[in-house]
């Protein structure tokens, strides 16, 4: 009897996993796309940068390549258009992230007014509020 019980439990588990693994509907993908764009849209480059990138690309100067490009549509390109994602360049995103990091002030990690430097093992805060180093 335990063999049949374990078989049915396993079968139930497989059916549950298959039910969870089915693809999401297009509505949920569009909703997710809108939420991500609202949340992280400021990291994407503006349309001006996209226009400059298209002008600078060597493919834009070849008319026969542009004619053939519409025939050779890749699935990930089609999906990005369907979701409403704008094409972006990794360099522009990286440049914006580095600019944001350089504009944020870094926290001073030296000696503080309340105690010694942090040393090898950090500091200990005593009951009376005094900080002492744990040594090296």
From Swiss-Prot:
| Transmembrane regions listed in the UniProt entry | none
Listed under GO biological process in this entry are:
blood vessel diameter maintenance; cGMP biosynthetic process; receptor guanylyl cyclase signaling pathway
State whether keyword Signal applies: yes
Could you tell me which Pfam families the record lists for this protein?
Answer: ANP
Give the matching PROSITE patterns.
NATRIURETIC_PEPTIDE
Its job: Hormone which may be vasoactive and natriuretic. Has a cGMP-stimulating activity.
This protein is called what? C-type natriuretic peptide prohormone
Q: Which organism is it from?
A: Triakis scyllium
Q: What is the lineage of its organism?
A: Eukaryota, Metazoa, Chordata, Craniata, Vertebrata
């Amino acid at each position: 009897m335990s063999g049949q019980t374990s078989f049915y439990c396993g079968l139930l588990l497989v059916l549950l996993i298959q039910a969870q693994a089915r693809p999401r509907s297009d509505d949920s993908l569009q909703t997710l796309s809108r939420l991500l764009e609202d949340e992280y849209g400021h990291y994407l480059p503006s349309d001006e940068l996209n226009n400059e990138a298209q002008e600078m690309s060597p493919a834009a100067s070849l008319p026969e390549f542009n004619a053939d490009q519409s025939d050779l549509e890749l699935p990930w390109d089609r999906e990005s258009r369907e979701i409403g994602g704008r094409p972006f360049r990794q360099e522009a995103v990286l440049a914006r992230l580095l600019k944001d990091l350089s504009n944020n002030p870094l926290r001073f990690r030296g000696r503080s007014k309340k105690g010694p430097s942090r040393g090898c093992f950090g500091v200990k805060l005593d009951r009376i509020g005094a900080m002492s180093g744990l040594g090296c």
